[in-house]
Amino acid sequence: MADPARAARLAQRIKVIVAEALRKQVKQPGVENITITETRVTNDLQHATIYYTIFGGTEARQEAEDSLAKSKGILRREVGKNLTIRLTPTLEFISDEVPETASHVEELIRLAKERDAELAARAARAEFAGEADPYKKPEDDEAAES
């Protein structure tokens, strides 16, 4: 087994190689909208999982997925040519859901800020339930003793 540091370095190198190959060599329609976000390689260096995002709607997403499936062989050949390892890892492309998750989290944060502002406005209008200063003062004790 390879050490995890080597797998991480190899993953970073594969990310660069695949991104460059998509930009320069793959002529499939739809690959111009693909951004490689992350790459992970197993510790035995036999399998690489490549995460990507696509700018555009569902039609662009489907076109990009088809283009990646068709160009997987070209990309694997480029990875093999540019790496100095005995076996070229298999490539698996997975759509990265980070942008959708991030927009959902941003929406939740916006709602929380709105609720905080509403609560602060209520607190500013609120009045004390009892006296303004609920603590006993020394002069109150002297007046009660006399």
Swiss-Prot record:
InterPro entries: KH_dom-like_a/b, RbfA, RbfA_dom_sf, Ribosome-bd_factorA_CS. It is found in: Cytoplasm. One of its GO terms (cellular component) is cytosol. The keyword Ribosomal protein does not apply. PROSITE patterns: RBFA. Keywords: Cytoplasm, Ribosome biogenesis. Residues 127-146 are annotated as: Disordered. The keyword Cytoplasm applies. PANTHER family: RIBOSOME-BINDING FACTOR A, CHLOROPLASTIC-RELATED. Belongs to the RbfA family. One of several proteins that assist in the late maturation steps of the functional core of the 30S ribosomal subunit. Associates with free 30S ribosomal subunits (but not with 30S subunits that are part of 70S ribosomes or polysomes). Required for efficient processing of 16S rRNA. May interact with the 5'-terminal helix region of 16S rRNA. This is Ribosome-binding factor A. It comes from Renibacterium salmoninarum (strain ATCC 33209 / DSM 20767 / JCM 11484 / NBRC 15589 / NCIMB 2235). The gene is rbfA.
